[in-house]
Amino acid sequence: MFNCIEGVENKIFHGINLKYYSNKLEDLKIFEEIIKSRKIMSRNDLIKMRYEHFECLPRIYEQCENEICFAMHPKNKNFSSVYCNDDSLSAFYEYIRFNISFVFLESILNNGYSLQDGGEIRIPTSLDIDKDLVAIGCFDEIEYLLEKVNRGKSKNVMFSEQLIKCEDIHKYISEKKKRTYIIKNLLKKYGYNVPIIDPLTGNIIDSNYEKNIEDVKLLKKVLIKNI
């Protein structure tokens, strides 16, 4: 049983970023609509189908009515020239961090794309997701923050207020597990056989996996100290 997907740094990501939605639709609802339709749609296509939540669409779609926005992995060497030294300013962290994402093979770029600053990629068409989808990404926030702390870089980390303010670590982890479980069930419901991964590392996330409580308590102390 493998525990990660190979070559995650060469994959292309499309993320559900709730900060672009005007009335904060639940990302699980948007996720289900996408996997049910089996298509990531451009603004034009959403207009044609009279998309129920059109008024709540991300502003990002207004950049071009036919484009869809993606992000490359910050370790993608083929496009490293468009990244700045601060990973946190990249499209990957802007669109993928804390959000559900769709992970695709690089072959989705074969029909043309435009490359923007910060590792953003725009594809000039709607995308059928069955062919090139290899995984669903759920950012493993705790693993990411622990790795930063262990490397002595906690002062520069983009901490999570949700984690810091959470009084009950067990409840926090339980909610993370519940979310992964819901995503896994939705994938099964609509006939998808792809893993759920941490998009940064490619590690497969098991809905039964529980982070070490003491590690998370230590992490909270470090983050609070550096606010």
Name these PLM-found stretches.
Residues M1-I227:
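NAD-dependent ADP-ribosyltransferases
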